[in-house]
């Protein structure tokens, strides 16, 4: 979400205990604005920064060498500060360039932006993200504001939860595999306290519009010269409504709508009132849900309203470069959420193959769009009403099915990623993990390295990639023993790559670290070494989240003596962690990731191959036949209970990874 030029907002100095849900930069006031959702009033409160925080970036040039920048009107101050260089593992002096406007740092292709003039650090971070990181503000966490001071609020965990955490989690942390166990335990504890905070029911409304068409040509959202013929609504308070515009040549048709759906007709010259009434409804709900609302519904409504002369004071919408938002609320475009591969694969198990509302609804809900067999311009009034309201219904239900699963997931992921919920709903998992790591860098006073600095660590280093167009070798696949096999057990390495990252301290700054004494800590199957002096940031974060999911949330969600609300929370948190963890290795191994480091990616897959091969050898040693193996699982034939227990213990003792029974088959054909 980029700068918002003229948010019209109800800004307040005192806010009751509320969930921080979003943030934006207000271009007009040159300040960050925070949005808090209050579960009791079901409203969003808006608070604008009063701390005097300013945009900035860093340079490794001395302040006197940057003196020429001081002549600029938008440069406030250049001063020396100390930051920790993670690649050299030492504190260094850097120049902090403080400016009046984020555009003075970046955002243009001209010399107006300092990053185009001097080599700079941390100059590609959105200003409102910088603000959140610097103030240790976590989206999805509860805060109250008293006299313009933000005060964190943590709900106390129950005695039962604390006891469960101790028995399931902390008692198992004795052998963490981490360089600094105390730091790791603190990280786990902090995550558990944050993720166990309640997730509120969020009041929201979905919206879908229909527009006149000109033959097969789609309406142009910028010109917006075609009439809005219908707007459908569905809300969390049970409201079901549809506005329909009367036009010449349209038949009334038969009213077969559900009796709970209210139909409101507008005369053909009342399109302006129809849109104004729709805006009135939008203002009553803190969160607006659409399906492709960024690409069509909201920009069309916004531009159509301008064309019809509707006052900007009445219009609650605000258009940005590639998305749409609300001046006093939050807009979630589910098209972009369900297009996210992490959701498609890890949450919804690829139940849909394309991202249309119809395909997603059929796959996830088992429901679909109305089909009258005619184009919408040939439908009757009541067919248009039903068609449009049904789209709003499907859009809303995608957030409400399975006890508000998607909404709850989005809130939990905002907590993990430290990112506004509207950004979470639109951006891929690589952006989530980038935000989380940047937050942790800032918390620890680490200077976020430039891409070329990280690449410089491995300059001139050969690797043994064997697959065309791959920079490093991937996971291992063992050729199957062909034939029909009876009594086959599939054993799965629980979160294998996150486990490897944790146990072997893999992070961009700890693989091939600068310490001579660490070079003897060789990583099997590579020419690399791992740090033995400090926890890597990636290892610490991914490892703590992995342990929480495997040792705590997965087990806790299955306990019998917990409330339905607790079970729902633990299940959702476990799923959110699954999404992050399953995607984490792929993200770290993607060249486009800003903290990508080839040796770390290479070490992760090399260790995966090594663990699989070593486990197969251990199986042979206890006369357990392995029929097949892939990236993180083994098919074993007719195992005894003792053999299963032995191989699980060997994997844990030798490699710090957890092997578990996934499936059991009477027979398999390989």
Language model segments and positions:
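Active-site-proximal segment of RNA-dependent polymerases
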Residues: 470-472, 601-609, 617
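Short beta-strand
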Residues: 87, 625-629, 661
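Generic non-transmembrane alpha-helical segments
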Residues: 364, 611-622, 646-654
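Active-site palm subdomain of RNA-directed nucleic acid polymerases
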Residues: 369, 608-631
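Gly-rich Lys/Arg/Thr-decorated short loops/hinges at beta-loop-alpha junctions or inter-strand turns
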Residues: 248-262, 587-606
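Core alpha/beta catalytic barrel or barrel-like domain that forms the active/cofactor pocket
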Residues: 372, 585-592, 624-631
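The two-metal-ion catalytic cores of nucleic-acid processing enzymes
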Residues: 1-341, 347-457, 461, 470-489, ...
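C-terminal polymerase-core module
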Residues: 637-670
